[in-house]
Design a protein with these regions (language model features):
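N-terminal first transmembrane alpha-helix
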Residues: 1-105, 174-194, 203-215
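Loop-to-transmembrane boundary segments
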Residues: 9-23, 116-172
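Charge-rich cytosolic interhelical loops and cytosolic tails of multi-pass membrane proteins
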Residues: 77-147
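Membrane-embedded alpha-helices of multi-pass membrane proteins, especially ion channels
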Residues: 164-168, 196-201
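N-terminal signal-anchor module of multipass membrane proteins
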Residues: 182, 198, 218-221
Length: 221
């Protein structure tokens, strides 16, 4: 999980695993600091797993919720393509594609007008993706996925943290369950994650995307 992928297809399963781990740590912290109830489980329902029995017992001392929600969000990450769909909904993908890929390519081609949605789609599907796939120097591609992978890991964690904190806030306001921790600390964590994601994007993802675009030969554009 710590070694970055070299392609989008390599990234996906690694992203789902990373989401499981970051979510587990996050929900474990929520239970420890009084933001979520400790929901136990009867030991007879735990299957015997050789060499991991003590570890599993330790995990379940924090209740079933951290492991259950980690599995849930990991499945959501894969089944619903969480990072990609949320990025599209809030406009990150549109900004990323338009300003870091499509406009620079259009400028090289001498096109100054705004492209239509259909033209933008063709630039991405018929030019950018095929040409990047055919690049002989894979160094730029690998550097790109090195940075993008970590961006998506923290992006998915930010989405999950935001939804979770929102639900915990509603639970505290409606007395759905006992929340002893400060909501201010939770929202500060979410804001910090958003700021960190923005920093990763500006400092790493943006220059790597621009560098990759520059590798496309002018005569292909």
């Amino acid at each position: 999980m710590l070694e970055p992928p070299k392609s989008y297809n390599e990234m996906l399963p690694m992203l789902h695993k990373a989401t499981f781990i970051t979510t587990f740590i996050f929900y474990l912290s929520l239970v420890i600091y009084g933001y979520m109830p400790l929901v136990g489980i009867n030991a007879k329902y735990i299957p015997p797993i050789k060499d991991y029995e003590e570890f599993i017992k330790w995990i379940l001392t924090f209740g079933i919720l951290p492991i259950a929600f980690s599995i849930f969000w990991s499945v959501i990450s894969g089944a619903l393509d969480l990072h990609n769909n949320v990025a599209k909904i809030i406009g990150i993908r549109k900004v990323w594609d338009n300003y870091l890929i499509i406009k620079p390519l259009a400028k090289i081609a001498g096109v100054t007008r705004k492209l239509t949605n259909d033209e933008s789609y063709k630039v991405m599907s018929k030019l950018y993706y095929p040409e990047i796939k055919e690049l002989k120097d894979k160094h730029y591609v690998e550097l790109f996925w090195n940075k993008v992978y970590y961006f998506w890991v923290f992006f998915e964690h930010t989405v999950i943290a935001f939804i979770t904190v929102l639900l915990i806030s509603l639970a505290k306001l409606t007395n759905l369950f006992s929340v002893t921790g400060s909501l201010n600390n939770l929202w500060l964590w979410v804001i910090s994650l958003i700021a960190f994601n923005f920093l990763i994007f500006i400092a790493s993802v943006k220059p790597r995307t621009e560098s990759q675009v520059r590798q496309i030969p002018d005569d292909k554009i």
